[in-house]
Every structure is written in C-alpha cells, then in structure tokens.
C-alpha cells in the first residue's frame, strides 16, 4: 500500500515511569489515498485503529482520499502474565477464525504486547515467538516498565480485516464458543496438576470428563480402568488415571462400624439409609455393590471384599463357636447351610447370638411330635381329630401372613408403581427412597407397619428359606458387619429395591448381590 507521508514533528523528550499510560514515541501524518482503511494505516504505522480515531477525533472508521491523519506510534506497556487455563490455543490473529499456531500449557508465562478491541492479546512467548490469545485466560499480571521504542511484529500482518474483527467480537460475547475452541479448562485458580500421579481421589465438583482433561486420558479409558458402567463418580472414590494403576483401584470392602455413622465401601457407589426418631436423629450409611442384573458386567467383579469366614474355620466341623461380629447369615454362608436350619438345630427362636455360644451347624433336625390329639385345631386336612399333621408347631396358614396371594399381589403392584424413581439417603417416599424407606412405604400402603431400618426389619420378620420364600417376602443382604440392604422379593430370583441407581428390578443371585445374600423374612 503506497501512502504519502509528511513528517510534522518529533517529540523532544519522553517521560517514562513504571505503571504509567503509554507515551508517544513519535508523531507523523499520512495522506489518505483511494483504497486506504484505518485498519491498514494502523498496521503500516505500528499503531491501532482506536489510537488513530482518538488522535484524529474520529467517531467512525470512515476516511476519504486526501484526508490527513495524525499517526502516533505508541510505546507499549508490556505486561507479564501466565496462562490460567489448562491449555490455551495461540492463534495467528485476534479471533477464533484464525489458525491455531500452538497451544500453551497452564502456568506458562507470556508477555502481553498489546490488547485488541475484542479483548484478545498479542503475546510474546518462548524465545521471541508471537501470537494472539483470548485475554480472559491470562492471569497473575506483573507490570513491567514500558519499552522505549515501538515494536511492530511481522505476524501482525496476518490479522483479519475489520469485518472479521466485528464477527470475532460477536463470538467472544458467547463464552461457550471460546471455551470449546481455545481453552480446555477455564478454572483460573486450579491447583497444580501432578502429571506423574496414577490415582486421583474424587473431590466435590469432580466429573469423569474433568478428570480426563486434567490427566490427559480419555473418558472411555478412565471408565475401563475403573470398571465403571456409567460416568457417575462419588466423593472419596479412588480413580485410576493411568493404566498402570488400573488393577489397584477397585474399592476395597472396608467396614467402619462405629456409631453414629457406619460406612462400608465395597465395589460401587454409596447407598445410605437414615433413621429418624421423635427425639434424636441417627444416621446410618449403607454401602452396596453395584446393583445390576446377571446380564450386566458389574464393578463388584473387580472388588476383593474380605471373605466372611476367618481362614482358620474348619468348614467340615459339625459345630462352631460364635466370635465377635458373627451373624447367623454369615455362619450359614460359611458352612453351606441356611439360617433356618441352624436355628432349628439349636432350638433358637431369635437371631441373637452371644460370643462363645457353641452352635450345631450340621446334622439332622430332630423330628417333632405332631400328634394332634392335644391340638386338633392344627388339622388342616380333614375333620378327624385323631389324624396327624407334620410340624403342628409351625403355622403355615398363609392367610395370616403378608405374603398370602392377595396381600403379596397388592404389595408387588404398589412396588411396581415406583419403578424408576430416584434414590436418596433418608428418602421415605413417595418421590425418592432409600432401601428400607422404600419397603416401609410400600408395606404401609397395604396397612402393614415396618421398622424404619433394614436391620430392624430383618429382626422383626420370620425367617424362611429360599425354597419357602414367596412373592411379597423381604430379602436381606449383609456386606460384612450386619444387615445393610433390603428389597421386596417378587419370585424367580428377582426383587424390586431402591438402590443408588433408583428403584429397579435386580437378580438376587447376580453379580454384586449373590455373595452378600443373607436370606428371606416374612412379615
């Protein structure tokens, strides 16, 4: 572009002080020729459009051939800043329409040479390299003394034309557009990332996507390394962020049984249960494994929960001495029998155990004298008072149980109404539930009152074997320190329960369930 320039004056002296506004380095005039624009004149003279308009008292960008313009070159006030995003794209011009030159890592120090009208900065980085970045992703400014002479960088000639600048300004008004293209993560106060870390403990606000960006791993890899079936993570969860740590990150079955908050971590997100009384509020956290059907790969497969029996237990023995922490369910599981059989062998009427008790765990249940001459009312087969029935002491009349056909149908129908509703700790319904809140609510709709916690519900029911279990019975699970979960049995090995994925069907023998199954209870 050819222009006629006539030097008018040169400043006699320049006063430069730290933190002062830019000072005039020299002054000249140019005569506008056909085809000239303010933007082109500014580029040729090492200044900006705003400086030209201010020096010549222009209110628009319109100029005409023959017009004389005063041009002032400015000594830029250089500022040292650092990249506040995780990664920041450096472009060839001031706007997202320009090509990406490189990307700078968070914390990289740069020198701001100038600021454009759209908020973008021309920067110097590395060994004298220049480019443009969005100024909103620079922070920690340290102001240096102004340079004595103006620098016009060659890269400035690659700036877009004024019409493109206007387009860029519109885009900058939409933060999402810039965020997606130029800053991987825009947290200005993010702590330094340990790039050598192999695991990460989840904190409030963390997401799988944020961790993938932070550690440079894909979301798919993180989910694979941690056996996650969804992108849901929870505070305190230990996440492998490098493949080398994948085998060591399955949450351990760790039980903390101290009151008032008992928390167990096995292989899945937390399921918690709240107990409310009129005078106090006791919080009980129940943690389950991933609730999934038998056709789903569950995170529980990767967990190595501590086995219930101690390694020294002789499973061939016919008796067992009760130790601290034992339950009938755990003992039954150890010796391959059922709770009801152990109770029958030992004449137990409740599930309460005392440390030191010696229990029979194998043998034949003694026959019961079933002569009904003294108890004719137990005869359910005919009207002859001399007939015998089996086990008259056990009343199997299902009309006296909540599990009879009509009651069971009503209970299951009520449970099905809530399929898909959300889980919440302490949820009593009808919009959200925890496990025992769900069973309490469903039974209450049929006029049956249950205790509020799963442990209390287990204690209040009559225990039945799986072969005796009927739809409408309760099914209980123990993860190592007592009853921790309850669902409503619907038959065929299925239950409806409230767990961390909401109210849903689950296979009681499926992955993450079968190894923790204690047994069934009838209300």
Swiss-Prot record:
Low complexity: compositionally biased ranges: 157-167, 251-282, 290-318
Domain NlpC/P60, chain residue ranges per copy: 405-523
Signal peptide positions on this chain: 1-27
Enzyme class: hydrolase
GO biological process: proteolysis
UniProt KW Electron transport keyword: no
Keywords attached to this entry: Hydrolase, Protease, Repeat, Signal, Thiol protease
Annotated ranges, domain SH3b: 78-142
SMART domains associated with the record: LysM, SH3b
Keyword Metal-binding belongs to the record: no
GO molecular function: cysteine-type peptidase activity
Active site feature: 435, 485, 497
Residue span, LysM domain: 28-71, 198-241, 318-361
CDD domains, A to Z: LysM (cd00118)
Cited InterPro entries: LysM_dom, LysM_dom_sf, NLP_P60_dom, Papain-like_cys_pep_sf, Peptidase_C40, SH3-like_bac-type
One Pfam family cited in the UniProt record for this chain: NLPC_P60
Region Disordered: start-end pairs: 146-188, 251-323, 367-408
Entry EC number(s): 3.4.-.-
Function: This major extracellular protein may be involved in the invasion of non-professional phagocytic cells by Listeria.
Protein family per UniProt: Belongs to the peptidase C40 family.
Entry-linked PANTHER family: MUREIN DD-ENDOPEPTIDASE MEPH-RELATED (PTHR47053:SF1)
Entry remark concerning the domains of this protein: LysM domains are thought to be involved in peptidoglycan binding.
Protein name: Probable endopeptidase p60
Organism: Listeria seeligeri
